[in-house]
């Protein structure tokens, strides 16, 4: 199947990773709203005076408690204001990377003056929806993002509609890389990872550079819940073993600490999430260092991890009640297992054990506590790999795990897509009651 480096399936796999694994500064739900505000502001000639915004319940959930980088403030209003006043409309998920201290001060002043509002979009059939309407005198511009964190579907100003996205364009062309990926299998992904030329996937090493830098930053300071730094102290005190398992736990947690605490460093995201990118990257990096892997082996392991994470997550809603750090960690389990022995059965067993272990962990919004879930998921991934290396795994006789790993994944995703919808509504209701 893989005779040529020009194999079209390889190209689709690589494109899928390039589409879904991107740098992102700050939690991607507030950033999505910041991007809408920045694009709207770019359509205006005058000084921005006010911002009104509307978001879906799921985006509200993931924006209530997370720190916006550089501001020291949490929530969607500061993201909307800073996007409008200091955002780079052309930078996608890095929209806030060049925001100046002056723009941050102006954004805080705009909030204090009561000139920023963020409301629930009701009714709203879209899981991921953000709309920002930015005003300058009598002029205004409104930008709507739907379905993906950077997927702008409409731009309108006081002079009329200037852009609407047509859905038919991509369908008339060839099938999207994600659609192609969803119709393959973990075995085909593994075959690709083993055979693709290194030069074609070298780019994935940037994930190690960016997320490794976040991890180092998390260990330096008191970002977020500073789980990584705290566990490192406990390790030095002899309360935690100084071993590979602990290194995975500490370094992965630290990256998420910095990410959720508002560090002004980008994460390499996966499936629109910085924490998913961290979870799919850092554990694999730590194991690669332990086994002395060179750049090529690290790149192949990271490619397997990120592709597997995308493959699983694509079967889920973009945002749901299921914590997607768990599915990203299933990718990490695949990457770590590949580094340890490379066998498909080891990878499949590790993922099956993950599904039998951390399935059902809820997403209760983006916040500092995400780093707890990231650390739990990373630890579970390594535990599952250790079991698989000894030919032990949760079997198809137990719970939602099936005898086939592909069916196990389908069972997990069915839970998130159907049964957990009421869980999501309940979580949002609880969080909304706390906000009032």
Swiss-Prot record:
Similarity-based family: Belongs to the UPF0597 family.
InterPro entries linked: Ser_deHydtase-like_asu (IPR005130), UPF0597 (IPR021144)
HAMAP family: UPF0597
Domain of life: Bacteria
Name this protein carries in UniProt: UPF0597 protein CKO_04510
Pfam families, per database record: SDH_alpha
GO molecular function: L-cysteine desulfhydrase activity
Transmembrane segments: none
